[in-house]
């Protein structure tokens, strides 16, 4: 399936990583690519090996016209809910760009509240290079944060499962309780904290 780009001079792609995990921030990225400096091999970050993702992460940061990361921490996720916290994080990523785009393409079926034109693109991380680039920046950023969190809390296995509710993570949550970085509004964490 071919994506037909809207008519615009400066297009930013936006994607998020980390809506499903029980721990840590939801991380978003916004990227404006440089047509004069193409990047080969951009695709949905989930379809790339970690090695390839890391290489592309460096290349995107080097070659893009501009890029920015936006985030929402667990406290904000618990206060707003994951959907609205994700929208806020996307707004922060776009606001953080050093060049203002005239069009923003967002992965998924909903756009955040932006001061410029925007369009949601289902499967955008596979169809739109700018969104693929954003998905890679967001994923590598979040994965590295989970590796850091793993050093603080080595028993939970964060470096491996990245905070997603795997059987191992659920087992540790039940036996060790929640860390301060867990999302207290998420049902499995609520259960572990006896908040249900």
Curated annotation (Swiss-Prot):
One of its GO terms (molecular function) is RNA binding. Manganese or magnesium. Binds 1 divalent metal ion per monomer in the absence of substrate. May bind a second metal ion after substrate binding. It is an enzyme of class 3 (hydrolase). InterPro entries: RNase_HII (IPR022898), RNase_HII/HIII (IPR001352), RNase_HII/HIII_dom (IPR024567), RNaseH-like_sf (IPR012337), RNaseH_sf (IPR036397). Signal peptide: none annotated. GO terms for cellular component: cytoplasm; ribonuclease H2 complex. One of its GO terms (biological process) is mismatch repair. Its main location: cytoplasm. Its EC number is 3.1.26.4. It is found in: Cytoplasm. It comes from the Bacteria. It catalyses: Endonucleolytic cleavage to 5'-phosphomonoester. SUPFAM superfamilies: Ribonuclease H-like. Its cofactor is Mn(2+); Mg(2+). A divalent metal cation binds at residues 15-16, 107. Residues 9-196 form the RNase H type-2 domain. Keywords: Cytoplasm, Endonuclease, Hydrolase, Manganese, Metal-binding, Nuclease. Endonuclease that specifically degrades the RNA of RNA-DNA hybrids. Belongs to the RNase HII family. This is Ribonuclease HII. The lineage of its organism: Bacteria, Pseudomonadati, Pseudomonadota, Gammaproteobacteria, Enterobacterales.
């Amino acid at each position: 399936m071919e994506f037909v780009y809207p008519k615009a001079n400066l297009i930013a792609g936006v994607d998020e990583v980390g809506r499903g995990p029980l721990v840590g921030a939801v991380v978003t990225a916004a990227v404006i690519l440089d047509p004069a400096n193409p990047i080969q091999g951009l695709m949905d970050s989930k379809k790339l090996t970690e090695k390839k993702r890391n290489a592309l992460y460096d290349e995107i940061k080097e070659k893009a016209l501009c890029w920015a990361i936006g985030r929402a921490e667990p406290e904000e996720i618990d206060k707003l809910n994951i959907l609205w916290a994700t929208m806020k994080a996307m707004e922060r990523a776009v606001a953080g760009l050093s060049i203002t785009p005239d069009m923003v393409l967002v992965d998924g079926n909903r756009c955040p509240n932006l001061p410029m034109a925007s369009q949601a693109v289902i499967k955008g991380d596979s169809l739109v290079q700018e969104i693929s680039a954003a998905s890679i920046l967001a994923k590598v950023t979040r994965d590295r944060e989970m590796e850091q969190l793993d050093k603080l809390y080595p028993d939970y296995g964060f470096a491996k499962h990245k905070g997603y509710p795997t059987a191992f993570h659920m087992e540790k949550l039940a036996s060790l309780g929640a860390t301060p970085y867990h999302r207290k509004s998420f049902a499995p964490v609520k259960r572990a904290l006896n908040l249900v």
